[in-house]
Structures are given as C-alpha cells and as structure tokens.
C-alpha cells in the first residue's frame, strides 16, 4: 500500500476560539505556498485537520517540507480508504505484516467521529486486533508504550490509518499576527530574527539595502537566497531592495567618522519605517543583539530608535552569538550568511565607531542633510520581488564560482 495523504494536526490554533477557521485557512494557504514545487499536491482543511493529498507524489519530501511550517503541531502519513470493515481488516493486516519483526508489540487505537458507522471504537479495536493475530500469531499486544500504535480514524468522508506521528514546528501560522518589516543585511543574525518572528505568526516583508557599486550583485543574490530559506516556514515573502548609494556617499562625505554607523542606521530606520507605513505594516524587526557590536549598545539603540515611534521587535536581543549561530545552522541559513559578500553595514564601517553616541550629536550632524529628500528618493526607488520556496538556480553559488 502507498500513502494517500499527509494528515496535519493543528498547533496553537485550538486556543483561538471564534478565529479558529481564519487561522486554519491561513495555515492551508501557507502550506499551499510551501508545497508549490509539487504541482500534483492538493490541500484541504477542516476544523480538526488539514489533509495534503499526495496524488502519486513521493511522501518523504512532502513530510520534510511540512515539518518546517509554523502552525503545524504534528503530521502523519496516512492511508485513506472507504469506510468498509473488510477493507479495514485487509489494510491493517497488510500494514502490520510489512512492519513486523521478532518481539514487536502493537496496539490498535480507533477514533470514530462518524457515529453512523456500524461498529463503535471498542468493537473496531477488538476486530482489527484479532485480524492482526490471524496473520501474525506471534505478535504481542501491549497497551502502554507499544512499538507500533496503529491509529484508525473513522470520519464522515473516509477511514484513515496511520502509525507514525512526526513532530511539527509548532508556533502560529505566518500572517495571523499582522505584518512587519524585517531589516535583513545578509549576516547571521537577521535571518534568525526573521525565523523567530515568523514562528509567532508575523507576516514579514524583507527590507534589504543595496549600495552599488560598493555592494555587489552577489550581496543582493545572497540576501534573496536567505529570504528564500525563510519561505520554507510559511510561504512566499516580499523582498524589498532599497537603493542606498546616495545616502551612504552623503554620510561618508559629511559626517564624522565615529558617527558614520549611527547616522547610517538612523537613515535605514527612517526608510524602513516609511516603507512600513506605505505597505501597511505594524512593526519593524531586526537582528540586533545587545552589546554584540558598536551599533547595538543601549546608547546606540536609543540614538537610532529616536527617528521612529514604531515598535521595534528584536527577537535575538538577549542571545549570545554562539546561540544565534546554532539556530542559524539549525534553520539552514548559516552557510549562506557567511558567504563573502559585503553589505551596506560593512562597506564604510569606521575603525573606531562610537559605542555610546549622543542623540543630540547625531541630530546636529544630520542638519547638513536633506533628510526628507534622501528618504523620499530611496523609498521611490525600491524594487519589490516576490520570493517563493521554489529554487530555479543558485545565483550565489554561480557568482562565487565566477569569482574563484
């Protein structure tokens, strides 16, 4: 027998009361986005489960993809069949025969939501357990902690049989907690921050600052590849490329070296906030970790935050660098993040950046800039690209090969 579908059990959605179906429908849409590279797949949801019909597709890559999607509590590859006692008996016998080894213990666990079915749960447990003993007389039944728990569900539309339960990612479906703008540089920290924001249901749009010719096409492709990795957790993500060359040159030419980073980050924050307002976001997300670098001291954060009243979420703010690296490796962004392309935060980095910048000094040094004009030109020049889970080719790898 081949698996018919993957049955997805919902996570925290059980706590969402009247909004439950809105959350479930969002999860369904996210699953469809994540599984877009598998065109034969179909997805449908009800109040208790989401059903991913395989339609001949190999189940293993589907399971690997679904394990990462936020909002999924657990999933099981299942056999779907008609609600017929003879068919159930044959299926249970075939499955247990294929799993059998010496000393194997098992139990049948039946759940019947279709109360019009001819047998109740206890009768089905007895009948199907007896059918297993007919073909495997040496097998042992064990009610507590058996090697195999064969789950049989009798639902209104069909019967389902499964024996594996695979842990999902948990969290909330992406998009159920509103929209935020993720400031993604291309380093290690910001993709991890994005991952953690996605886990709590935030629909992120990625804001990436590019300063050609100082930053290369490889840096842009790297940021897009990082964004693509994040799509595995909840579906398509809008990638917003911001032209930043003019602003960085202005800062380099007019500002004291010690304040280059502070003023650069203040402009980035202004632009991100303007994009957020334009695209109806609610928060800004970044990868700042307290005390990790000069721009991430409390004094620096205060001076940079002063340009906006928008809430700023810093998911990794209390994490050590090694903790962030471990998480980046776990979510498969680390190897991309360490690829050798400079970003806007490093190209003009001063040797001795100010670790305790004063807000008054930052505002004084900005008096020589046309702040509104610079921000407006940057926002009007943005390029928005939808990033999907499907990988056509790996542009960053190609660029690295060309450099070597």
UniProtKB/Swiss-Prot annotation:
The keyword Nucleotide-binding applies. It catalyses: [ThiI sulfur-carrier protein]-S-sulfanyl-L-cysteine + a uridine in tRNA + 2 reduced [2Fe-2S]-[ferredoxin] + ATP + H(+) = [ThiI sulfur-carrier protein]-L-cysteine + a 4-thiouridine in tRNA + 2 oxidized [2Fe-2S]-[ferredoxin] + AMP + diphosphate; [ThiS sulfur-carrier protein]-C-terminal Gly-Gly-AMP + S-sulfanyl-L-cysteinyl-[cysteine desulfurase] + AH2 = [ThiS sulfur-carrier protein]-C-terminal-Gly-aminoethanethioate + L-cysteinyl-[cysteine desulfurase] + A + AMP + 2 H(+). Residues 60-165 form the THUMP domain. PROSITE patterns: THUMP (PS51165). Gene3D superfamilies: 3.30.2130.30, HUPs (3.40.50.620). Keywords: ATP-binding, Cytoplasm, Nucleotide-binding, RNA-binding, Thiamine biosynthesis, Transferase, tRNA-binding. The keyword Transferase applies. Pathway: Cofactor biosynthesis; thiamine diphosphate biosynthesis. GO terms for molecular function: ATP binding; CCA tRNA nucleotidyltransferase activity; tRNA binding; tRNA-uracil-4 sulfurtransferase activity. PANTHER family: TRNA SULFURTRANSFERASE. Catalyzes the ATP-dependent transfer of a sulfur to tRNA to produce 4-thiouridine in position 8 of tRNAs, which functions as a near-UV photosensor. Also catalyzes the transfer of sulfur to the sulfur carrier protein ThiS, forming ThiS-thiocarboxylate. This is a step in the synthesis of thiazole, in the thiamine biosynthesis pathway. The sulfur is donated as persulfide by IscS. Belongs to the ThiI family. This is Probable tRNA sulfurtransferase. It comes from Streptococcus pyogenes serotype M1. The lineage of its organism: Bacteria, Bacillati, Bacillota, Bacilli, Lactobacillales.
């Amino acid at each position: 027998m081949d698996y018919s579908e993957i049955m997805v059990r919902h996570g925290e959605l059980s706590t969402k009361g009247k909004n439950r179906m809105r959350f479930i429908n969002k999860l369904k849409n996210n699953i469809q986005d994540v599984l877009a590279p598998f065109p034969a797949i179909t997805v449908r949801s009800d109040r208790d489960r989401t059903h991913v019909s395989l339609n001949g597709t190999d189940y293993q890559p589907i399971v690997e993809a679904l394990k990462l999607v936020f909002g999924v509590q657990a999933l099981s590859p299942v056999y779907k069949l008609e609600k017929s006692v003879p068919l159930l008996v044959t299926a249970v016998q075939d499955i247990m025969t294929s799993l059998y080894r010496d000393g194997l213990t098992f139990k049948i666990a039946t759940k019947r939501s279709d109360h019009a079915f001819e047998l109740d749960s206890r009768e089905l447990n007895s009948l199907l357990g007896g059918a297993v003993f007919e073909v495997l007389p040496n097998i042992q039944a064990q009610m507590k902690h058996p090697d195999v728990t064969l789950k049989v569900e009798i639902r209104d539309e069909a019967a389902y049989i499964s024996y594996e339960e695979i842990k999902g990612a948990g969290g909330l479906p992406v998009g159920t907690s509103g929209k935020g703008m993720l400031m993604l540089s291309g380093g290690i920290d910001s993709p991890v921050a994005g991952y953690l924001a996605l886990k709590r249901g935030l629909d992120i749009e990625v804001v990436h600052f590019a300063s050609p010719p100082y930053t290369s096409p490889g840096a842009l492709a790297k940021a897009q590849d990082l964004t693509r990795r994040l799509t595995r957790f909840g579906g398509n993500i809008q990638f917003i490329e911001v032209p930043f060359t003019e602003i960085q040159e202005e800062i380099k030419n007019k500002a004291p070296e010690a304040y280059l980073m502070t003023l650069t980050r203040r402009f980035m924050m202004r632009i991100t906030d303007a994009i957020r307002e334009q695209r109806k976001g609610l928060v800004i997300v970044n990868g700042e970790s307290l005390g990790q670098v000069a721009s991430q001291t409390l004094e620096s954060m205060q001076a940079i935050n002063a340009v906006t009243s928008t809430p700023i979420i810093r998911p990794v703010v209390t994490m050590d660098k090694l903790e962030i690296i471990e998480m980046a490796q776990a979510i498969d962004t680390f190897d991309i993040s360490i690829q050798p392309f400079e970003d806007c935060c490093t190209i003009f980095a001063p040797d001795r950046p100010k670790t305790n910048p004063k807000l008054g000094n930052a505002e004084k040094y900005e008096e020589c800039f046309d702040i509104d004009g610079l921000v407006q030109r940057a926002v009007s020049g943005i390029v928005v690209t939808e990033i999907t889970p499907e990988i056509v080719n790996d542009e960053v790898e190609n660029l690295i090969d060309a450099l070597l």
